[in-house]
Design a protein with these regions (language model features):
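Glycine-rich loop(s) and the adjacent beta-strand/alpha-helix scaffold that form part
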Residues: 1, 112, 123-196
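A short alpha-helix-loop-beta-strand transition element characteristic
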Residues: 6-12, 17, 62-69, 161-168
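FAD-binding core/adjacent interface of flavoenzyme oxidoreductases
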Residues: 18, 25, 106-111, 125-129
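Short His-Asn-centered micro-motif
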Residues: 22, 105-106, 141-143
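Short, solvent-exposed loop/turn segments at secondary-structure junctions
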Residues: 24-25, 31-33, 110, 145-147
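A glycine- and small-aliphatic-rich helix-loop capping segment at beta-alpha/alpha-beta transitions
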Residues: 31-37, 156-161
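Conserved redox-cofactor binding core of oxidoreductases
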Residues: 36-39, 43-120
Length: 199
Protein backbone atom coordinates (compact mmCIF):
# COMPACT_ATOMS: atom_id res chain seq x y z
CA UNK A 1 0.00 0.00 0.00
CA UNK A 2 1.12 3.54 -0.69
CA UNK A 3 1.55 6.20 1.94
CA UNK A 4 -1.21 8.80 2.07
CA UNK A 5 -0.06 12.36 2.67
CA UNK A 6 -2.64 14.98 3.58
CA UNK A 7 -6.27 13.96 3.76
CA UNK A 8 -6.35 11.07 6.22
CA UNK A 9 -9.91 10.20 5.18
CA UNK A 10 -8.74 9.16 1.72
CA UNK A 11 -8.44 5.41 1.22
CA UNK A 12 -6.69 4.47 -2.02
CA UNK A 13 -8.03 0.93 -1.86
CA UNK A 14 -11.62 2.21 -2.13
CA UNK A 15 -10.96 4.84 -4.79
CA UNK A 16 -10.53 2.26 -7.53
CA UNK A 17 -11.92 -1.21 -8.08
CA UNK A 18 -9.86 -4.09 -9.45
CA UNK A 19 -12.71 -5.83 -11.17
CA UNK A 20 -14.25 -6.24 -14.59
CA UNK A 21 -15.72 -2.85 -15.41
CA UNK A 22 -13.25 -1.04 -13.18
CA UNK A 23 -14.18 1.93 -11.05
CA UNK A 24 -17.38 2.43 -13.04
CA UNK A 25 -18.74 -0.16 -10.59
CA UNK A 26 -19.07 2.59 -8.00
CA UNK A 27 -18.29 5.90 -9.68
CA UNK A 28 -20.56 8.91 -9.31
CA UNK A 29 -20.90 9.42 -13.05
CA UNK A 30 -20.39 13.19 -13.20
CA UNK A 31 -18.90 13.86 -16.62
CA UNK A 32 -17.63 16.81 -18.63
CA UNK A 33 -14.95 17.46 -21.26
CA UNK A 34 -11.41 18.10 -20.11
CA UNK A 35 -10.11 21.66 -19.87
CA UNK A 36 -6.93 22.85 -21.57
CA UNK A 37 -5.01 22.80 -18.29
CA UNK A 38 -5.94 19.12 -17.79
CA UNK A 39 -3.83 18.06 -20.77
CA UNK A 40 -1.13 20.73 -20.60
CA UNK A 41 1.64 18.14 -20.10
CA UNK A 42 0.14 15.58 -22.47
CA UNK A 43 1.38 15.13 -26.07
CA UNK A 44 -1.97 16.41 -27.35
CA UNK A 45 -3.20 19.55 -29.05
CA UNK A 46 -5.84 21.63 -27.28
CA UNK A 47 -8.72 20.45 -29.47
CA UNK A 48 -7.45 16.97 -30.34
CA UNK A 49 -9.93 15.23 -28.04
CA UNK A 50 -12.94 17.11 -29.41
CA UNK A 51 -13.46 14.64 -32.26
CA UNK A 52 -14.00 11.88 -29.68
CA UNK A 53 -16.63 13.74 -27.63
CA UNK A 54 -19.67 12.42 -29.50
CA UNK A 55 -18.59 8.77 -29.30
CA UNK A 56 -17.57 9.16 -25.65
CA UNK A 57 -20.99 10.53 -24.76
CA UNK A 58 -22.63 7.61 -26.58
CA UNK A 59 -20.58 5.19 -24.48
CA UNK A 60 -21.60 7.02 -21.30
CA UNK A 61 -25.27 7.34 -22.37
CA UNK A 62 -25.23 11.12 -21.93
CA UNK A 63 -25.94 14.11 -24.17
CA UNK A 64 -23.01 15.82 -25.83
CA UNK A 65 -24.11 19.18 -24.44
CA UNK A 66 -21.95 21.03 -21.94
CA UNK A 67 -22.72 24.68 -21.31
CA UNK A 68 -19.99 26.88 -19.91
CA UNK A 69 -20.39 30.54 -19.07
CA UNK A 70 -18.29 33.11 -17.26
CA UNK A 71 -19.82 34.46 -14.05
CA UNK A 72 -16.99 36.86 -13.34
CA UNK A 73 -13.28 37.33 -13.86
CA UNK A 74 -12.57 34.54 -11.38
CA UNK A 75 -15.52 32.14 -11.68
CA UNK A 76 -17.01 30.04 -14.47
CA UNK A 77 -20.25 28.10 -14.45
CA UNK A 78 -19.65 24.62 -15.86
CA UNK A 79 -22.33 22.07 -16.69
CA UNK A 80 -21.85 18.37 -15.96
CA UNK A 81 -23.79 15.43 -17.37
CA UNK A 82 -24.64 12.44 -15.17
CA UNK A 83 -23.91 8.91 -16.42
CA UNK A 84 -25.21 5.81 -14.67
CA UNK A 85 -23.31 3.42 -16.96
CA UNK A 86 -21.60 0.39 -15.43
CA UNK A 87 -19.16 -0.84 -18.06
CA UNK A 88 -19.28 -4.45 -16.88
CA UNK A 89 -23.05 -4.57 -17.39
CA UNK A 90 -23.06 -2.67 -20.67
CA UNK A 91 -20.15 -4.39 -22.42
CA UNK A 92 -19.82 -7.85 -20.82
CA UNK A 93 -21.60 -9.75 -23.59
CA UNK A 94 -20.00 -7.66 -26.34
CA UNK A 95 -16.50 -8.38 -25.03
CA UNK A 96 -17.14 -12.06 -24.35
CA UNK A 97 -18.54 -12.61 -27.84
CA UNK A 98 -15.91 -10.57 -29.68
CA UNK A 99 -13.46 -12.35 -31.98
CA UNK A 100 -10.97 -9.51 -31.55
CA UNK A 101 -10.84 -9.29 -27.75
CA UNK A 102 -9.27 -11.74 -25.32
CA UNK A 103 -10.74 -11.17 -21.87
CA UNK A 104 -8.28 -12.09 -19.10
CA UNK A 105 -9.60 -11.96 -15.53
CA UNK A 106 -7.93 -12.47 -12.13
CA UNK A 107 -4.65 -11.19 -13.56
CA UNK A 108 -2.69 -8.14 -12.48
CA UNK A 109 -0.36 -6.15 -14.73
CA UNK A 110 2.87 -5.65 -12.77
CA UNK A 111 5.09 -3.67 -15.15
CA UNK A 112 6.41 -3.35 -18.68
CA UNK A 113 9.76 -4.76 -19.78
CA UNK A 114 12.04 -3.13 -22.35
CA UNK A 115 15.52 -4.25 -23.37
CA UNK A 116 16.27 -1.40 -25.77
CA UNK A 117 14.77 1.38 -23.56
CA UNK A 118 12.73 2.57 -26.54
CA UNK A 119 9.78 0.21 -26.80
CA UNK A 120 7.95 -2.36 -24.70
CA UNK A 121 9.00 -5.95 -25.31
CA UNK A 122 6.32 -7.50 -23.12
CA UNK A 123 4.05 -6.87 -20.15
CA UNK A 124 4.75 -8.91 -17.04
CA UNK A 125 1.60 -10.02 -15.25
CA UNK A 126 0.79 -12.00 -12.14
CA UNK A 127 -1.93 -14.65 -12.21
CA UNK A 128 -2.50 -17.23 -9.48
CA UNK A 129 0.95 -16.43 -8.02
CA UNK A 130 2.67 -17.21 -11.33
CA UNK A 131 4.35 -14.82 -13.76
CA UNK A 132 2.85 -14.42 -17.23
CA UNK A 133 4.43 -12.53 -20.14
CA UNK A 134 2.16 -10.86 -22.67
CA UNK A 135 3.56 -9.54 -25.95
CA UNK A 136 1.77 -7.22 -28.35
CA UNK A 137 2.51 -4.84 -31.19
CA UNK A 138 0.89 -2.00 -29.24
CA UNK A 139 0.01 -1.53 -25.57
CA UNK A 140 -2.67 0.91 -24.42
CA UNK A 141 -2.43 1.64 -20.71
CA UNK A 142 -5.94 2.58 -19.60
CA UNK A 143 -6.23 1.46 -15.99
CA UNK A 144 -7.25 4.75 -14.39
CA UNK A 145 -5.29 7.44 -12.58
CA UNK A 146 -4.04 5.34 -9.65
CA UNK A 147 -3.27 2.10 -11.48
CA UNK A 148 -1.62 3.82 -14.46
CA UNK A 149 0.73 5.62 -12.10
CA UNK A 150 1.44 2.48 -10.08
CA UNK A 151 2.31 0.47 -13.19
CA UNK A 152 4.51 3.19 -14.68
CA UNK A 153 6.29 3.85 -11.37
CA UNK A 154 7.03 0.15 -10.90
CA UNK A 155 8.21 -0.06 -14.52
CA UNK A 156 10.58 2.82 -13.85
CA UNK A 157 11.75 1.17 -10.62
CA UNK A 158 12.66 -1.93 -12.60
CA UNK A 159 14.36 0.02 -15.41
CA UNK A 160 15.12 3.67 -14.67
CA UNK A 161 16.46 4.29 -18.17
CA UNK A 162 13.18 3.36 -19.86
CA UNK A 163 10.94 6.02 -18.29
CA UNK A 164 12.23 9.55 -17.77
CA UNK A 165 12.85 10.32 -14.10
CA UNK A 166 11.63 13.90 -14.63
CA UNK A 167 8.11 12.90 -15.67
CA UNK A 168 5.65 13.76 -12.86
CA UNK A 169 4.17 10.26 -12.68
CA UNK A 170 2.04 9.71 -9.60
CA UNK A 171 2.28 13.32 -8.45
CA UNK A 172 -0.57 15.76 -7.95
CA UNK A 173 -3.21 13.06 -7.64
CA UNK A 174 -5.98 13.85 -5.20
CA UNK A 175 -9.37 12.54 -4.28
CA UNK A 176 -12.58 14.45 -5.01
CA UNK A 177 -12.42 17.79 -3.19
CA UNK A 178 -15.77 18.24 -1.47
CA UNK A 179 -16.98 21.53 -0.04
CA UNK A 180 -20.28 22.70 1.38
CA UNK A 181 -20.85 25.88 -0.58
CA UNK A 182 -24.00 26.95 1.23
CA UNK A 183 -27.55 26.08 2.12
CA UNK A 184 -30.59 27.73 0.58
CA UNK A 185 -34.33 27.42 0.09
CA UNK A 186 -35.40 26.35 -3.39
CA UNK A 187 -38.43 27.95 -5.01
CA UNK A 188 -40.46 25.08 -6.46
CA UNK A 189 -41.44 27.23 -9.43
CA UNK A 190 -37.81 27.55 -10.53
CA UNK A 191 -35.77 25.00 -12.47
CA UNK A 192 -34.88 22.16 -10.11
CA UNK A 193 -33.29 19.82 -12.64
CA UNK A 194 -30.04 19.74 -10.66
CA UNK A 195 -30.24 17.43 -7.67
CA UNK A 196 -26.64 16.45 -6.96
CA UNK A 197 -23.70 17.53 -4.88
CA UNK A 198 -20.99 19.99 -5.78
CA UNK A 199 -17.49 18.72 -6.46
Amino acid sequence: KGKIIGDLNTNLSTNRLRQFGGTSGHWGGWSKPMEKYNIKLWPLKDNELNSYSKRTCEILNIKNQFRKSSLSEFFNQVEFQYSNVRFADKYKNHIKNSNNILLVLNTQLSHFVSHNNKSVEYAECISNKSIKKISAKYFILACGGIENSRILLWTREKNQEFINEDLPIGKYWMNHPWILGGIGIINKKTDNSYNGDTE
